[in-house]
Amino acid sequence: RPWEIGVLATVGRARVRTHRRPRVAILVNGDELVSLEDFDEVLAGRRIVDSNSHALAAAVRAAGCEPRLLGIARDDEGSIRERLSAGLECDAIVTVAGASVGEHDLVKRALAGMGFRLDFWRVRMKPGNPFSFGHLDGVPVFGLPGNPVSAGVTFEVLVHPALRLMLGRSAVHSPTIGVATGETLEPLADRVQFLRVRLEKEARGTFTARRTGPQGSGILSSLARADALLVVPAGDEPIPAGTRLAAIPLPAPDEGQASSGF
């Protein structure tokens, strides 16, 4: 922080040990995806634009790390292995899609063929259940679901804390604040939900969380409009409006960075 640098100058420290910004490789997978340069394919209804690369690169920068885009790997194990090999030069790899069970989920097979060690797969959370984590040649690999909201939520809840650890931060877990629910909520019996919400400040200084709209895992606007994730614990009974729950504030726009990173 600026004033810490001032303190160092005050005590005559011209050089200090620091943590290098981790380099994070990002790989997306899918024959249906195209880059922004080929947006005409999207307009023609033949393809889907790759939004995850841009969103995750911005999230990695906001976390204080350096993103490296590995591009779009096609549904071919050779293509996936080639791009993953390039990512081994980085400090961490984030893959998007190919983390769930399905005939087109080739990332796991490609990783297995390269000697990947899977530490765990599946987390009892929604969205983001098919998240995976392991190591490839000593490099941590985070496997995110392909749906944009699932990818964004798992990054904030599971990947961001790991990046804080790599940066040498003492506080690695995402901070939470207590908020009141703005409506009755229906919890899931077997997993924690992370609802995208806006926090409204009340006259008495407390906050009320209200959903940003439909919460489908493909509705990226629900995350774009949110300033927090409301943590809804698993349970069998409805949660009445006004109940106090924890919320994870999402990173605010950086005043010093006007560029979107495109």
Predicted regions and their residues:
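Flexible glycine/proline-rich
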Residues: 110-262
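Short, glycine/charged-enriched hinge/interface segments at domain edges or termini
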Residues: 1-69, 213-214, 249-251, 262
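A general structural motif
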Residues: 47-53, 73-78, 121-130
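N-terminal small/polar loop signature for handling phosphorylated ligands or for N-terminal nucleophile
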Residues: 54-115
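A generic local secondary-structure boundary/capping motif
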Residues: 10-18, 45-47, 84, 121, ...
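Hydrophobic/aromatic beta-strand patches that form the interior of the parallel beta-sheet core
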Residues: 27, 68-71, 140-142, 177
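Residue-level signal for inorganic ion chemistry
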Residues: 26, 60, 94, 197, ...
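Short glycine-rich anion-binding loops that position phosphate/pyrophosphate groups of nucleotides
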Residues: 31-32, 98-101, 146
